[in-house]
UniProtKB/Swiss-Prot annotation:
Keywords: Phosphoprotein. Residues 110-125 have a biased composition (Low complexity). This is Uncharacterized protein At1g76070. It comes from Arabidopsis thaliana. It comes from the Eukaryota.
């Protein structure tokens, strides 16, 4: 027992001697790579922790909002999700999440608001519509200009009653203009379609009162419609105004009088 006790007490003494022999400025250390949360925490969080990781991070990653608070018990409860960056397209627009409710269901009206029509009422309506259509076809072929409206209403009272009850099914019997007539009135190209120039020229030749006005075309000669004086070059100028016109001479304004500098000297051309 004494030997064992002696050996156990001699080991710490030897360690102390070695430490005393070392210089005080010298120290031991080991190089540790820089901490990377994506590398160290993601890969080593669920498996094992190294000594280097324990030095920098001592506990697991805990979210700010606990998982129990994220569960909604009712639909009216708010969702406390952690804020994240939105998804952005290549243009720069924020991508919104898809709507849970499709658009087709919103447009559909509830079945309680749609009135239900019995089968007996629908069958009676269809029979009245058929009778009204047949009576209208007969009235079109048996239409007289003198008493067209009165006879059609008296002879077919069912059509009138059907028109009063269901005004949507009434079709006007007035003649619809054709496409050619609509195009004719849409533009003014056919306004002078029946105009005859030969007839108008005859009327001008027969009326001597218009000869002195000087109306002529490019193809006609001016001598037939104009009065010439002794000189052939001078034409009669007709002014359609009774009172005399007061013509004033133009006033030439000397702009150099308004300027402070002297006007330039006129150019003199020397003949060689």
């Amino acid at each position: 027992m004494d030997i064992k006790h002696h050996t156990s007490t001699s080991k710490p003494k030897n360690k102390n001697k070695l430490l005393k022999m070392l210089p005080k400025a010298m120290s031991f250390g080991h190089r540790v790579p820089p901490f990377s949360p994506g590398r160290d925490l993601h890969h080593n969080n669920h498996h094992n922790y190294t000594a280097a990781n324990k030095m920098f991070f001592s506990g697991p990653m805990v979210p700010l909002v606990p998982n129990a608070a994220r569960v909604r018990r009712n639909k009216s409860d708010a969702v406390w999700d952690e804020p994240t960056s939105p998804k952005v397209s290549c243009i720069g627009q924020i991508k919104l999440g898809k709507s849970k409710c499709p658009t087709g269901k919103k447009n559909k009206a509830p079945s309680s608001l749609i009135p239900k029509i019995s089968k007996t009422s629908t069958s009676s309506l269809t029979k009245e519509d058929e009778k009204g259509r047949l009576s209208k076809i007969k009235s079109i072929f048996s239409f007289s200009p003198a008493s067209g409206r009165n006879t059609s209403r008296k002879s077919h009272p069912t059509a009138v009653s059907a028109a009063d009850e269901h005004p949507v099914t009434v079709v006007s019997t007035a003649a619809v203009p054709s496409l050619g007539q609509m195009k004719k009135f849409a533009s003014s190209r056919d306004a002078l379609g029946d105009f005859d120039w030969a007839v108008e020229m005859k009327h001008e030749e027969e009326s001597p009162a218009d000869h002195h006005r000087g109306y002529y075309s490019d193809d006609d000669t001016r001598g037939a419609y104009l009065r010439y004086d002794d000189d052939e070059d001078e034409d009669d100028i007709i002014i359609p105004f009774s009172a005399p016109l007061g013509l004033k001479p133009k006033k030439e304004v000397n702009l150099w009088k308004r300027r402070t500098m002297d006007p330039p000297k006129p150019l003199h051309l020397q003949t060689i």
